[in-house]
C-alpha cells in the first residue's frame, strides 16, 4: 500500500472505491445516501486546488497488478490557511485495519506543516469509530442530537 496525493487520473479508482461503500459508509461520509456517484462529483474529488485542499489516497496494487483505492483523507482549509476541516472515508472491505488512524495522523502532520492552527470535523452521532479517532488525538468534542463537532488546536 502507498499513500499519495490524489490526481485527476484517479477518477476511475475513486469511482470503483465508491462502489464498495455500504449505505452506512455513505451516510457517515456524505450525511446522506448518494446512489451513483456522478462524473461532476468525481471531478470535484479528483481535481483539487492544492493551495487550499489536499487529498491523500491509500492505493494498493494486487497480485494481478490491478490498482485499487482503499480510502481517502481530505483537508480543506479556509482562504488564509488558518483553519481546516478534514474528512476520512475507507472502503468497506478495508474497514478495521487501522487505515482511518493512519490517515488521521498523516493529515494532522500535513496541517501542522502548512501552518494550520485549528482542525475541525463533523460526524454523525453514531459514527463511534471517528469519535474514537478524535478522542485519541486530543480533539475537543461537542455534540447535539445528530452530530459530533470536533476541534483540535495545533
Predicted regions and their residues:
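Long, contiguous binding/interaction regions
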Residues: 1-154
Amino acid at each position: 500500500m502507498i499513500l499519495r496525493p490524489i490526481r485527476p487520473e484517479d477518477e476511475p479508482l475513486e469511482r470503483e472505491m465508491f462502489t464498495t461503500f455500504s449505505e452506512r459508509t455513505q451516510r457517515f461520509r456524505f450525511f446522506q445516501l448518494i446512489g451513483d456517484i456522478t462524473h461532476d462529483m468525481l471531478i470535484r474529488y479528483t481535481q483539487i486546488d492544492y493551495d487550499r485542499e489536499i487529498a491523500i489516497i491509500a492505493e494498493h496494487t494486487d497480485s494481478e497488478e490491478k490498482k485499487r483505492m482503499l480510502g481517502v483523507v481530505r483537508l480543506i482549509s479556509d482562504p488564509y490557511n488558518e483553519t481546516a476541516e478534514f474528512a476520512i472515508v475507507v472502503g468497506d472491505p478495508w474497514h478495521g485495519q487501522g487505515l482511518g488512524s493512519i490517515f488521521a495522523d498523516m493529515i494532522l502532520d500535513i496541517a501542522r506543516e502548512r501552518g494550520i492552527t485549528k482542525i475541525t470535523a463533523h460526524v454523525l452521532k453514531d459514527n463511534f469509530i471517528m469519535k474514537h479517532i478524535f478522542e485519541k488525538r486530543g480533539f475537543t468534542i461537542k455534540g447535539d442530537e445528530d452530530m459530533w463537532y470536533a476541534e483540535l488546536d495545533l
